[in-house]
């Protein structure tokens, strides 16, 4: 990929000057000056409408941001990803999660080999297997059908399937339950096992290498629990499958290698829900809905690859994010879905964004002198309104926020959905407009307040407004729409990493803690005091040993 220091581009210099010109302007004025601002600052793809008009941008801002994308060679970098070049250079890998959802017969090459036959073969394996689980054809060791699927994984092997199965609960097969165990804290597996019957439970062990410490610790605990009831180790093969590539370790565990679902090193963990890692999704909502998820993502892939940048949803969202991150010095972004089914959506992209773009070294190995990935967080509306929106409205920090909502609810009970959506629309309007001192004064006078009372309370009721938001409105939360939304954010993250000149597809920062944990674990088995670390770590370990007795 092209390596361009963004702050040394002509576009960046123009953006710095433009920021000085625009930083104190209010969005209220932008709307007054342009009655067609909504039309000019919104884009659509299928059933998804993205309104970015409530941002502190003008046509000039977008023009300069688009110049940055062109000057940095973004088009070429997009093509490099889709064509299978090794853009994950620190691990010498292609980045081809987009191949997993590709529709059609065109080849996709990785290291000169068309990966699509293997992708289709695993998808067919998933289709057949999930069908056998759902229809009850697959029997447990006592001849009973499977009712509960437990996915044991961590990170990308957990967060994606958790988020998607929560989002797609309305599509769940009526007799299927799905559970997820990720944390190595024994509480997670213990509380999950309490809910299960070993005769009707299927465990999916999601680990590419079949050596991931947290996952395999939980897997062996699950196997021991199962064998307490089943007795014979031969029954493991009816109740455990593997999402892995380590055939030898899978068979040693007791899993039939015919029930090993493969994925490849060009699939990053946080982009793996589209692969065999999505088997729990297919078993929960049916392969036909998993396929719709893939088709929705593919539609966004085509849009991202083909549309001009000025009409390209992921590109525009990424550029607006850079505008706030690098020029307004915003530290965080909020993702606020007004749909309870999407309650894990912010957490999923917390990993997707922060693990991808939480980097401080550029693609040449030099320390960056510009801000990179933001902190991502969020909760569903309207809960967040009664928790943290106060700071977004009146705090000292700028927090750009994405508001997402479906026009149609899966649960159209009474007035619930209209009340929910009235809050969705009201919040972005309030964040944009705010409330001036004159408006507050008029309101208080109408309420019969005395002048001295007004003087005392007025400053506290003023909202500056000018708080930026994107509104993402879609017809209904279907598998296809969800696939498009996920791919939209994936590509936004890619664009930002590309323009910041960092590697978005490795995660070396995760490794050091893992290495140290392996050194510390044997020390916790020994009763002797520890003195091999810094004073704080020694003190904490020794205090732990004392508390353990």
UniProtKB/Swiss-Prot annotation:
Top EC class for this record: isomerase
Catalytic activity line of the entry: alpha-D-glucose 6-phosphate = beta-D-fructose 6-phosphate
Domain of life: Bacteria
Matching InterPro entries: G6P_Isomerase, G6P_Isomerase_C, Phosphoglucose_isomerase_CS, SIS_dom_sf, SIS_PGI_1, SIS_PGI_2
This enzyme's EC code(s): 5.3.1.9
Pfam short name (any one): PGI
GO terms under biological process: gluconeogenesis; glucose 6-phosphate metabolic process; glycolytic process
Its biological purpose: Catalyzes the reversible isomerization of glucose-6-phosphate to fructose-6-phosphate.
Record's protein name: Glucose-6-phosphate isomerase
Provenance organism: Desulfatibacillum aliphaticivorans
Gene that encodes it: pgi
């Amino acid at each position: 990929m092209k390596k361009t220091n963004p702050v040394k581009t002509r576009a960046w210099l123009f953006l710095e000057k433009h920021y000085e010109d625009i930083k104190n302007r209010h969005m209220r004025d932008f709307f007054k000056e342009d009655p067609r601002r909504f039309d000019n600052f919104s884009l659509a793809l299928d059933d998804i409408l993205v309104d970015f008009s409530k941002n502190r941008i003008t046509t000039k801002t977008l023009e300069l941001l688009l110049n940055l994308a062109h000057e940095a060679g973004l088009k070429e970098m997009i093509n490099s990803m889709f064509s299978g070049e090794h853009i994950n250079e620190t691990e010498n890998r292609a980045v081809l999660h987009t191949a997993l959802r590709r529709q059609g017969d065109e080849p996709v090459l990785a290291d000169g080999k068309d990966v699509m036959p293997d992708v289709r073969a695993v998808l067919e394996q998933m289709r057949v297997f999930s069908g056998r689980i759902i229809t009850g054809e697959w029997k447990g060791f006592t001849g009973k059908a499977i009712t509960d699927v437990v996915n044991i994984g961590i990170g990308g092997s957990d967060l994606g399937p958790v988020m998607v199965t929560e989002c797609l609960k309305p599509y769940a097969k009526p007799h299927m339950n799905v559970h997820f165990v990720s944390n190595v804290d024994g509480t997670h597996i213990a509380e999950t096992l309490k809910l299960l019957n070993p005769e009707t439970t299927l465990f999916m062990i999601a680990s590419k290498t079949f050596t991931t410490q947290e996952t395999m610790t939980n897997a062996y605990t699950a196997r021991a629990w199962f064998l307490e009831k089943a007795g014979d180790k031969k029954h493991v093969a009816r109740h455990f499958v593997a999402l892995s590539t380590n055939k030898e370790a899978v068979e040693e565990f007791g899993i039939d290698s015919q029930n090993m679902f493969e994925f490849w090193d060009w699939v990053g963990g946080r982009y793996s829900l589209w692969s065999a890692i999505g088997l729990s999704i297919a078993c929960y909502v049916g392969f036909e809905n998993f396929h719709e998820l893939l088709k929705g993502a593919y539609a966004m892939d085509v849009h991202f690859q083909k549309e001009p940048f000025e009409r390209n949803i992921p590109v525009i969202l990424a550029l607006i994010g850079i505008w706030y991150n690098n020029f307004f010095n915003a530290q965080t972004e909020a993702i606020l879905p007004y749909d309870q089914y999407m309650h894990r959506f912010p957490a999923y992209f917390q990993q997707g964004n922060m693990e991808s773009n939480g980097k401080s070294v550029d693609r040449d190995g030099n320390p960056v002198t510009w801000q990179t990935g933001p902190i991502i967080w969020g909760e569903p509306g309207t809960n967040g309104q009664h928790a943290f929106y106060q700071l977004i409205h009146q705090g000292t920090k700028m927090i750009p926020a994405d508001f997402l909502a479906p026009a149609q609810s899966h649960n159209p009970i009474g007035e619930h959905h209209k009340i929910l959506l009235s809050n969705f629309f009201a919040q972005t309007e309030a964040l944009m407009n705010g409330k001036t001192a004159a408006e507050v004064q008029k309101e208080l006078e109408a309420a019969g307040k005395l002048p001295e009372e007004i003087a005392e309370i007025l400053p506290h009721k003023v909202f500056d407004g000018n708080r930026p938001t994107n509104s993402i409105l879609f017809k209904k939360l279907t598998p296809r729409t969800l696939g498009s939304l996920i791919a939209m954010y994936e590509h936004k993250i890619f664009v930002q990493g590309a323009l910041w000149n960092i590697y978005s597809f490795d995660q070396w920062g995760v490794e050091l803690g893992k290495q140290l944990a392996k050194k510390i674990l044997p020390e916790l088995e020994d009763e002797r005091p520890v003195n091999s670390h810094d004073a704080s770590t020694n003190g904490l370990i020794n205090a732990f040993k004392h508390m353990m007795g």
